[in-house]
């Protein structure tokens, strides 16, 4: 992983710096949004947010991704400093077209885990070690991680990131994502209550 460039990114929650990274092995791009001074000895409030075009850009109500992205940026801004890594592994790393296929299977009654498995994938194909590389490049040694996903905590810890606290990121359910969130809690171990 290498840092390519950084620039100012004004948002409704204040000015972030956007850092552009490139994987050396395949040229895939990732970004980190940094708010305030992260060069302190206190653990950095951090979010590793996996790419979700449908939720983040198209406001899909099928998932909680867009709401989590917005809430994370607000929380980091309110905190006064922090980092959000936008992890470019769409659809829990099955890719956009396979995610749309999984949606079609969900429309026919499968849950999100069953749909992934029907397509030949595990419930979660993501590799969080890339995010550890980004934290290291940004010289972030200790984090408070905004997540409901114990798998993410474990994978980042295994990659050498010192997570001193898991900070819940609870967003409101809606009728379109209630079954999805129930599946994430029951089958993937997500902690969806404080």
Swiss-Prot record:
- Which GO terms label this protein's molecular function in UniProt? GTP binding; GTP cyclohydrolase II activity; zinc ion binding
InterPro entries tied to this protein: GTP_cyclohydro_II, RibA, RibA-like_sf
Q: Name the residues annotated as catalytic in the UniProt entry.
A: 124 (proton acceptor), 126 (nucleophile)
Any one Pfam family match given in the protein's UniProt record, by short name: GTP_cyclohydro2
Recorded GO cellular component terms are: cytosol
Cofactor(s) listed: Zn(2+)
- Tell me the cofactor note: Binds 1 zinc ion per subunit.
Answer whether the UniProt record assigns the keyword Zinc to this protein.
Answer: yes
Which keywords does the record carry? GTP-binding, Hydrolase, Metal-binding, Nucleotide-binding, Riboflavin biosynthesis, Zinc
Residue numbers binding GTP: 47-51, 68, 90-92, 112, 147, 152
Q: Which SUPFAM superfamilies match?
A: RibA-like
Which residues of the sequence carry a binding annotation for Zn(2+)?
A: 52, 63, 65
| Catalytic activity of the protein | GTP + 4 H2O = 2,5-diamino-6-hydroxy-4-(5-phosphoribosylamino)-pyrimidine + formate + 2 phosphate + 3 H(+)
Any Gene Ontology biological process: riboflavin biosynthetic process
Function text:
Catalyzes the conversion of GTP to 2,5-diamino-6-ribosylamino-4(3H)-pyrimidinone 5'-phosphate (DARP), formate and pyrophosphate.
Q: Which family does it belong to?
A: Belongs to the GTP cyclohydrolase II family.
* Binding partners and assembly: Homodimer.
Task: State the protein's name.
Answer: GTP cyclohydrolase-2
State the organism of origin: Buchnera aphidicola subsp. Acyrthosiphon pisum (strain APS) (Acyrthosiphon pisum symbiotic bacterium)
Q: Which gene encodes it?
A: ribA
């Amino acid at each position: 992983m290498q840092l390519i460039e950084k620039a100012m990114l004004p948002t409704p929650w204040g000015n972030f710096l956007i850092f552009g990274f490139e994987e050396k092995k395949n040229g895939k791009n990732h970004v980190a949004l940094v708010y305030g001074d992260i060069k302190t000895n206190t653990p950095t409030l951090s979010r590793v947010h996996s790419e979700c075009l449908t939720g983040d850009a198209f406001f899909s109500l099928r998932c909680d991704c867009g709401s989590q992205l917005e809430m994370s940026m607000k929380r980091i801004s309110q905190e006064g400093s922090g980092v959000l890594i936008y992890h470019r592994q769409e659809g829990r790393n099955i890719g956009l077209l396979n995610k749309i296929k999984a949606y079609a299977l969900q429309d026919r009654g499968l849950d999100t885990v069953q749909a992934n498995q029907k397509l030949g994938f595990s419930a979660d194909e993501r590799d969080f070690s890339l995010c550890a590389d980004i934290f290291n490049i940004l010289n972030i040694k200790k984090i408070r991680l905004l997540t409901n996903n114990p798998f993410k905590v474990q994978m980042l810890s295994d990659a050498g990131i010192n997570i001193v606290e898991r900070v819940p990121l609870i967003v409101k359910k809606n009728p379109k994502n209630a079954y999805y969130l129930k599946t994430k809690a029951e089958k993937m171990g997500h902690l969806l209550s404080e």
